[in-house]
């Protein structure tokens, strides 16, 4: 396969539609205005070529008509963001992925698979990874676990990297923390593509026995400790879980968790 075909194969997704983004010269709050929309036509090799040449930007819809995926992503839209530090942490965690700079200057953390994985399993594990990174509230692609094609459902698309590949700002980070060329990106995709069963079996940190009935994402957060900056989000989720677990004693239970796991504990006024 040539380089265009390899790039298209990496982002194989929904057959009958794709996304497009038109960027105007007009700016708002320092950012270029963009219009994104779904096109109910297949993502073709010609469209991929135009994307890589910087003519028309495209996006791929990860979830296919069978609710399975060949790729997925975390979309971290917080600033400032250190892509090199995120990439290093993910490699330390031994998570097979490729970190790219997004269109808006955030991070797209792409997961690639050598076989189809169910959208639900992908989203579950991706949420654990996001939580362990400290970005538990970020967007996950696919956004849906299930679509009903017979009623016209189409999943959400994610903008692809390497728009205008020769001088792109949507580049991957290589092992040395440098922007990777398109060819190097495709080498990283090949090297870091993973079997779905291996991906689902990834573990991070310690599991906390007292939260074994809670979601894996929340358990993961308590296993690594709750640093300042993420306490409100995590403790809100914990409050919901406590109400289900101990409806008559949830406030006391929540405060015990707060004192034990938050560093420093969340003030009572919050």
Predicted regions and their residues:
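DNA replication initiation on ssDNA origins
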Residues: 1-71, 80-86, 157, 162-165, ...
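Short secondary-structure junctions
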Residues: 15-20, 95-99, 137-138
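Catalytic cores of nucleic-acid ligases and guanylyltransferases
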Residues: 29-45, 65, 69, 75-88, ...
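Short amphipathic beta-strand starts and helix->beta connectors
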Residues: 52-60, 90-97, 220-225
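Modules that initiate DNA replication and primer synthesis
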Residues: 76-79, 88-91, 105-122, 127, ...
């Amino acid at each position: 396969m040539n380089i265009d075909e390899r790039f298209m194969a990496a982002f194989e997704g929904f057959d009958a539609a794709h996304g497009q983004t038109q960027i105007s010269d007009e700016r708002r709050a320092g950012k270029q205005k963009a219009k994104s929309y779904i096109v109910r036509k297949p993502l073709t090799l010609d469209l991929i070529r135009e994307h890589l040449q910087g003519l028309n930007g495209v996006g791929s819809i990860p979830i296919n008509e069978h609710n399975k995926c060949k790729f997925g992503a975390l979309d971290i839209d917080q600033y400032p963001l250190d892509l090199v530090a995120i990439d290093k942490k993910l490699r330390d965690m031994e998570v097979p992925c490729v970190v790219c700079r997004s269109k808006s200057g955030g991070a797209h953390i792409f997961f690639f698979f050598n076989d189809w994985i169910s959208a639900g399993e992908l989203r579950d594990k991706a949420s654990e990874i996001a939580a362990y990174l400290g970005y538990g509230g970020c967007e996950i692609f696919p956004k849906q676990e299930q679509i009903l094609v017979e009623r016209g459902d189409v999943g959400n698309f994610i903008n692809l990297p390497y728009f205008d590949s020769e001088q792109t700002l949507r580049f991957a980070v290589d092992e040395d923390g440098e922007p990777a060329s398109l060819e190097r990106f495709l080498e990283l995709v090949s090297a870091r593509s993973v079997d779905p069963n291996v991906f689902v079996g990834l573990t991070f940190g310690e599991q906390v026995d007292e939260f074994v009935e809670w979601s894996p994402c929340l358990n993961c957060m308590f296993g690594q400790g709750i640093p300042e900056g993420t306490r409100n989000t995590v403790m809100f989720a914990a409050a919901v879980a406590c109400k289900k677990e101990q409806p008559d004693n949830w406030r006391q239970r929540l405060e015990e968790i707060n004192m034990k796991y938050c560093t420093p504990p969340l003030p009572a006024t919050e």
